[in-house]
């Protein structure tokens, strides 16, 4: 990390193809460091201290770094086969990690020790998770039986997930889940097909447990936005394209539309992202 990185807000991006995580000053977008030694890094999440957790998809484990740090300070071993994403409860510090193949979520109390496992009803594969400001956990997934999107909630203090049927639009493929300050934002990686052969992505603002989609943010010019990050009036999206340009794009939020700016150098399969705010 460059000198001064620990005092700046940082954007972390997992670069799956090169088994590394890149750190940029935010909002400036200047590369300030690189973390290496991963095995398929995917999801990234930050806690209220600014520490980050990185999901090692083929590790399989989840590793923690201090804000701007270069040494691992904790490792949690995932008992499943393929962890994908994570989220930290802002109130308790609990860490939730989704496991793709087992279609469940592991929750580590206070981000320590062994997890408690929660199955996702009706889901064959689990993708992304996100806590809201009340400590309710939302997860999306997919079922091959009906080729359908699955959305579920683990209400704070409850022992099992409840399936939520979203109304107002069809989500074609699970994208990231994040609390945006007002709504539970849910991504659709395959919102619509483009002439270039890729799927333009979108983000839906939902009422969470209420099951209603109230707004849509189209990420114009995208190819496949996997794990976006919302920070204020900006959404940042790693754009993973098998045979195209791999970049990180910035859009206005919740307006969406045209790309405002981009980071284009040094990416090979960018997937996860998170904003880590500098400790006060």
Q: Where are these predicted regions, by residue range?
A:
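Beta-rich, blade/repeat-based domains predominating
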Residues: 1-8, 37-51, 79-94, 121-143, ...
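Short loop/turn segments immediately following the C-termini of beta-strands
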Residues: 16, 57-58, 100-101, 142-144, ...
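Short loop/turn segments that connect beta-strands within beta-propeller blades
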Residues: 25-29, 66-70, 109-113, 154-159, ...
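A generic tandem-repeat structural signature
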Residues: 53-123, 129
């Amino acid at each position: 990390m460059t000198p001064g990185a620990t005092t700046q807000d940082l954007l972390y991006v997992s670069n799956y193809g090169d088994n590394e995580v890149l750190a940029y000053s935010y909002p400036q977008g200047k590369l300030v460091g690189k973390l290496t030694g991963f095995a398929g890094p995917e999801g990234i999440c930050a806690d209220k201290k600014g520490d980050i957790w990185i999901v090692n998809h083929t590790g399989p484990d989840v590793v923690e770094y201090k804000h701007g740090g270069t040494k691992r300070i904790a490792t949690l071993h995932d008992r499943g086969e393929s962890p994908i994403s994570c989220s930290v409860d802002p109130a308790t510090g609990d860490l939730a990690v989704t496991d793709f193949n087992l279609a469940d979520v592991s929750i580590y109390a206070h981000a320590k020790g062994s997890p408690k496992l929660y199955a996702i009803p009706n889901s064959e594969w689990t993708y992304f998770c996100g806590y809201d400001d009340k400590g309710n956990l939302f997860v999306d997934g997919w079922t091959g039986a009906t080729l359908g999107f699955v959305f579920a909630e683990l209400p704070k203090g409850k022992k099992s997930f409840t399936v939520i049927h979203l109304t107002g639009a069809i989500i074609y493929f699970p994208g990231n889940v994040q609390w945006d300050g007002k709504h539970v934002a849910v991504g659709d990686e395959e919102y619509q097909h483009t002439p270039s052969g890729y799927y333009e992505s979108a983000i839906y603002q939902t009422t969470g447990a209420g099951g209603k989609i109230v707004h849509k943010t189209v990420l114009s010019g995208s190819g496949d936005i996997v794990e976006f990050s919302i920070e204020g009036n900006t959404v940042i999206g790693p754009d993973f394209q098998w045979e195209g340009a791999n970049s990180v794009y910035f859009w206005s939020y919740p307006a969406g539309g045209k790309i405002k700016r981009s980071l284009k150098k040094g990416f090979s399969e960018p997937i996860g992202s998170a904003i880590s705010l500098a400790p006060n």
